């Protein structure tokens, strides 16, 4: 049986009386792009910092491709690339020179590797400019390039697209997805961009208050037990409060003057249609709609700041 790319076993971190991470256990499957989500202060960054030992766990175990960090730290991290928060560089040197310095430390990077990396992260035209002239988004690109330079098997990224415009975000996530599909790279990525996580990630883990609250394949966790039915009316629209009085209807949200999103406790849009017709409402369109990752995230964390 193949070992997971990353395994956290009963991981805890306490800062005095603050329990930042509480008994967190998860396994990141190899060869996937995996999202790591949670509200602000949920423990995401603390967890990511513990993997390369930038922060030491209070208790628990971390294994990378089956290697326990406590037993062989260097071997475990040999196959890992990391970018957490805002990456730091030698600002007075060029982007290319910064990658060359990183390549010397890694010891297994060719000039061609640097050329290809600069091209794929979209900095080929600015590679000879000093980093101090780069925007935040460009520095994020360079940080990702440095993290993948040594051809790691596991890449750990904390908010990697901060400061990037939508086009740049798609370009970088597409680059990472290409590496996953073609090179077998595993990417463990923390991000507040839920739409992009839904589009690019295979699996997601959601933590809240330092604990794991949901996990699974994106398709599976968005296949809800309750269904959202978008319903358009010809004429009078029912009062949401009146609809919510029926226990089979869990939530009602007005989307447009003639349209409601109705959340059912069970997958039964046919019942809803009949129920509305019997109540005297004319339905012009009705269609079940799957939850988005944003809606799923809000339903289990209640956090609207990160939506």
Predicted regions and their residues:
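Short, charged/small-residue-rich alpha-helical element at the C-terminal edge
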Residues: 227-300, 307
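ABC transporter nucleotide-binding domain
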Residues: 173-263
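Short coil/loop linkers at secondary-structure junctions
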Residues: 68, 109, 124, 249-250, ...
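ABC transporter nucleotide-binding domains
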Residues: 3-6, 13-189, 194-208, 214
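Non-catalytic alpha-helical coupling and interface elements of nucleotide-dependent molecular machines
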Residues: 104-107, 302-306
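ABC-family P-loop ATPase nucleotide-binding domain
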Residues: 1-12, 303-307
């Amino acid at each position: 049986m193949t070992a997971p790319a990353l395994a956290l076993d009963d991981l805890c971190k306490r800062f005095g009386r603050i329990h930042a991470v509480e008994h967190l256990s998860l396994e990141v499957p190899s060869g996937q792009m995996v999202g790591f989500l949670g509200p602000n202060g949920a423990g995401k960054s603390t967890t990511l910092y513990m993997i390369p030992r930038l922060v030491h766990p209070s208790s628990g175990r971390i294994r990378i491709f089956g290697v326990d960090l406590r037993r062989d730290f260097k071997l475990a991290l040999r196959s890992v690339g990391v970018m957490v928060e805002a990456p730091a560089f030698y600002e007075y040197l060029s982007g290319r020179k910064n990658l060359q310095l990183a390549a010397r430390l890694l010891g297994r990077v060719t000039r061609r590797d640097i050329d290809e990396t600069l091209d794929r992260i979209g900095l080929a035209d600015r590679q000879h400019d000093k980093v101090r002239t780069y925007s935040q988004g460009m520095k994020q690109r360079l940080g990702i390039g440095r993290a993948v330079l040594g051809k790691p098997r596991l890449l750990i990224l904390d908010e990697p697209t901060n400061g990037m415009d939508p086009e740049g975000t798609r370009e970088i996530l597409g680059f990472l997805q290409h590496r996953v599909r073609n090179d077998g790279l595993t990417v463990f990525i923390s991000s507040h961009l839920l739409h992009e996580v839904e589009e690019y990630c295979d699996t997601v883990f959601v933590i809240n208050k330092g604990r794991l609250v949901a996990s699974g394949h994106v398709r599976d966790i968005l296949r809800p037990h309750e269904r959202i039915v978008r319903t358009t009316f010809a004429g009078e629209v029912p009062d949401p409060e009146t609809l919510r009085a029926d226990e089979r209807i869990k939530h009602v949200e007005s989307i447009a003057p003639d349209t409601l999103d109705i959340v059912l406790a069970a997958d039964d849009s046919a019942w809803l249609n009949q129920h509305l017709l019997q109540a005297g409402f004319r339905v012009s369109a009705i269609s079940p709609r799957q939850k988005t990752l944003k809606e799923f995230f809000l339903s289990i964390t209640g956090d609207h700041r990160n939506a």
